Amino acid sequence: MAGNTIGQLFRVTTFGESHGIALGCIVDGVPPGIPLTEEDLQHDLDRRRPGTSRYTTPRREPDRVKILSGVFEGRTTGTSIGLLIENTDQRSQDYGAIKELYRPGHADFTYDGKYGFRDYRGGGRSSARETAMRVAAGAIAKKYLDMKHGIKVRGYLAQMGDVVCELKDWQQVEQNPFFSPDVDKLDALDELMRALKKEGDSIGAKVAVMAENVPVGLGEPVFDRLDADLAHALMSINAVKGVEIGDGFAVVNQRGSEHRDEIRANGFQSNHAGGILGGISSGQTITANLAMKPTSSITVPGKTITRSGEEVEMITKGRHDPCVGIRAVPIAEAMMAIVLMDHLLRHRAQNADVHVDMPHG
């Protein structure tokens, strides 16, 4: 079956291609009475949209979202919310030369192998352009989580190449085009991007995302553990090749005496688990890291084949991001928010009558 939907009670279904007429999504499960306007969604869309700095793709899309249904007089009605974003800056002629080629590192080869037919313009459905609708839907979830439960979801660029950004100042994240919380690393990031542009190459990145004030109890063991669903959602983002929850792969070098999050009367003494124990939220901050591959859309010549099997050398033309991790921050926030809202609704549906006087954690 087509994998265009995520969530059970809070369900998001997206549609559209990179160079199609428009992108859209249907959001089901939003409780009624939530104040919601297009401007509520536009803030995060503006953070994600292309053409906003010299470090991202020059494709200039306004990404103005339209609410088609599910909202009346500024409040959600409880019915399906339809969202639409028109594509306005397609340059499909940039892709005519690759109609018969498989771009190395892209989904061209696998989409052809699966469907026997593909939209080669900008990658079609496989393009990260689709994530605009995830961000729009995620903005709804972020508003609900914050307004009703005080849950805040936010992320930042943790690393680009060898440049590591420390979490020094959250306010800085929105003040620079890199989403970096470390103002001391901005010059190094700028130098790296300039070098990549000169070389016609790209670089990978690590994006961090977290949720604060998440209550104890979210997650449905055993197959719908909260960390499993978060990993699924975050891995579904284009270019993500790895997801860590908490300390992630660093646990390989840790001892049990170090990794266990000891609990005292004043709460947990550490958070190596990333806010999730046994697949259920512990009440601590949920933390995750995403490893993002360097984009294969570069001007460095590469070897590939045509649909008929002929070996050729190609250079990718078009407008692309030298580091996809920069614009991935609002996408990661959206996917985490979508999962958390879905699990909040699922927890309420099954456990509404459960009241436990938990000690402070």
From Swiss-Prot:
Q: Give the compositionally biased regions (Basic and acidic residues).
A: 40-49
Sorted alphabetically, the Gene Ontology BP terms of this entry are:
amino acid biosynthetic process; aromatic amino acid family biosynthetic process; chorismate biosynthetic process
Which InterPro entries does the record match to this protein? Answer: Chorismate_synth, Chorismate_synth_AroC_sf, Chorismate_synthase_CS
Which annotated residues bind NADP(+)? 48, 54
Which Gene3D superfamilies does this one have?
A: Chorismate synthase AroC
Q: Where does FMN bind?
A: 125-127, 238-239, 278, 293-297, 319
Subunit note: Homotetramer.
Give the protein name, as stated in the record.
Answer: Chorismate synthase
Q: Report the source organism.
A: Erwinia tasmaniensis (strain DSM 17950 / CFBP 7177 / CIP 109463 / NCPPB 4357 / Et1/99)
